[in-house]
Amino acid sequence: MENSQSKENILNIDNISQKVRGAEYAVRGELVTIAGQMERDIEEGKRTDFDKIVFCNIGNPQAVGQKPITFMRQVLSLVEYPELLKNENINLVYPKDVIERAKEYLKETKFGVGAYSNSQGFYFILKDVANFIEKRDGYKADHNNIFLSNGASEGIQMFLSTIIRNNKDGVLLPIPQYPLYSALLTLLGGTKIDYYLDEDKGWGLSIEELKNAVSSARAKGINPRSIVVINPGNPTGQCLEVENMKEIIKFCHNENIIIIADEV
């Protein structure tokens, strides 16, 4: 008997979420897809106009030869395979500080690093992060208010998912910007509010520009709930002056706007 299910119900490009179709993540977009195909053509010996493809679409230093931080890799290897610590020649292979750090982590992770942790992250790591922030900034940090994420993208998605309720909620994004933000806003159904960095002033952030962006959004019925401040800038690389940061904080306090400080 022929399946009576309508073809319209089969998952395809036309009936998936239109928010997914509309999301544009330029750093992994069409140009990157084409470049990937060209790289495969080169590997397969097909004739092309190039003999090598260099991907510069994302910050990926190890892909172009940067060595990973040795300490982290060494500690990770011991934590992943604790049996190495029992080897009589361990001190010939691993530095003393690496061995001590690995033992400390293994003591705190009673069931091993393969077990699920607290949703915020391991408690002892949260305390270490809080202590680091306090030493760096001179301001006491509460470890209960710290969340560890699997990279910045997950943290950004978690936060935007929390504040975006409908298409009347807007987020101020710098132009130029890192396209992850606009792509996520499309997926979540929020509204992008552009504010433009001043190229003539080293890609600085003008408070007057923020005022205009907020006023324009509110005139259209959009509620500016948050602002993304990327510092150092991505892709511009500029660093905000301290006074500029203070101005932004005061402005957001007066306008009841949440600051997303992207300081990767």
Regions found by a protein language model. Give the residues of each.
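N-terminal "arm"/small-domain region of PLP-dependent enzymes with the aminotransferase-like
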Residues: 2-120, 131
